[in-house]
């Protein structure tokens, strides 16, 4: 009997979690996003504005020297990204270099997109905004 209650309890907990997270899942489903790849890795970016879309799509061409510099970061190194914006370079370092990243972004609206991008790429254990 106890086992049945545990299964029911577990099932009820999963159902409640789905109900609780429904607004977030709906939000992500309808919020515009784009994917960027360098051939080895792929990143997903929330693109609520044209500027965020352009920033994501040009991350490898707009600042190639920054990408080159990030490639010199030791594997599992630490990066402090000051003025992280929507997190293009934070996400790049975390995924491609397996780096721990501390990201600073002072603008609240941009910070919320940064947090969403961290979530979309499952990098919450690597990037700390």
Label every model-predicted segment:
Residues 1-122, 126:
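S-adenosyl-L-methionine
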Residues 129:
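Donor nucleotide-sugar binding/catalytic pocket of nucleotide-sugar-dependent glycosyltransferases
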């Amino acid at each position: 009997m106890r086992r049945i209650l545990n299964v029911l309890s577990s099932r009820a907990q999963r159902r409640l979690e789905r109900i609780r997270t429904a607004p977030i899942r709906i939000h992500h489903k309808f919020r515009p996003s784009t994917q960027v790849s360098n051939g080895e890795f792929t990143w997903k970016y929330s693109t609520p504005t044209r500027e965020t879309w352009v920033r994501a799509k040009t991350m490898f061409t707009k600042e190639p020297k920054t990408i080159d510099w990030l490639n010199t970061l030791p594997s599992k190194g630490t990066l402090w990204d000051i003025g992280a914006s929507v997190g293009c370079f934070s996400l790049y370092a975390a995924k491609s270099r397996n780096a721990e990243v501390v990201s600073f972004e002072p603008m609240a609206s941009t910070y919320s997109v940064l947090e969403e991008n961290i979530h979309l790429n499952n990098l919450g254990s690597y990037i700390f905004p």
